[in-house]
């Protein structure tokens, strides 16, 4: 089976086409107190149905190093204070921010939260300092069928595609 990975980017916050959630019970909050277990647990819970496998073999030490890294910021999405999803932003030394992981728990998919969650991720990426030159993400054909459309709807532009056999 061929898996296509698509890379998208945005070079200005003005490119963002926002989508808000009208339901006030849906909220997004940064995890100010770092907890690598939160990152690990959400990686498994969100990524299970999308075949996120590369980090399943990580040890607790690897998760701790990743989750506590100063360049990483993690945000949780909540609906009526129930955890609904998350995203991770990782800044590099060149002034680029990657939306490293992004997704909703299965029971919250299809409820109109994805666009609002991605809007928040992109807005928060542009707020990171010092100045940010680019926000980028990659998705693949194993991800949610609407993932690529959501990224493009928010104003992200494809800059590369790669195909690989699984």
Task: Specify the residue positions occupied by each region the protein language model found.
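Acyl-donor-binding surface of acyltransferase catalytic domains
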Residues: 1-32
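Conserved catalytic-core motifs of GNAT/GCN5-like acyltransferases
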Residues: 3-8, 136-138, 157-166
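Short amphipathic alpha-helix that is part of the acyltransferase structural core
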Residues: 20-55
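A short helix-loop-beta-strand connector motif used in the catalytic cores of GNAT acetyltransferases and
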Residues: 64-76
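Conserved beta-strand in the GNAT
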Residues: 76, 82-91, 98-103
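A conserved beta-turn-beta hairpin within the catalytic core of GNAT-like acetyltransferases
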Residues: 91-100, 109, 131-133
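Conserved acetyl-CoA-binding loop-helix of GNAT-fold acetyltransferases
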Residues: 101-104, 110-127, 148-153
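Conserved beta-strand-loop-alpha-helix junction that forms the acyl-donor binding cleft
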Residues: 109, 135-147, 164-166
């Amino acid at each position: 089976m061929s898996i296509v990975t698509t890379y998208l980017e945005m070079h200005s916050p003005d490119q963002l086409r926002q989508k808000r959630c009208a339901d006030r019970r849906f909220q997004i909050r940064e995890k100010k107190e770092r907890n690598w277990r939160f990152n690990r647990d959400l990686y498994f819970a969100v990524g299970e149905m999308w075949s996120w496998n590369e980090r399943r073999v990580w040890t607790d030490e690897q998760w701790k190093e990743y989750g506590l890294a100063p360049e990483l910021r993690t945000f949780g999405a909540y609906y009526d204070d129930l955890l609904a999803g998350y995203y991770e932003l990782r800044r590099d030394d060149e002034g680029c921010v990657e939306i490293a992981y992004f997704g909703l728990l299965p029971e919250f998919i299809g409820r109109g939260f994805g666009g609002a969650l991605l809007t928040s991720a992109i807005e928060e990426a542009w707020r990171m300092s010092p100045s940010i030159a680019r926000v980028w993400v990659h998705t693949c054909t194993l991800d949610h069928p609407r993932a690529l459309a959501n990224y493009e709807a928010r104003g992200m532009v494809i800059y590369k595609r790669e195909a690989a056999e699984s």
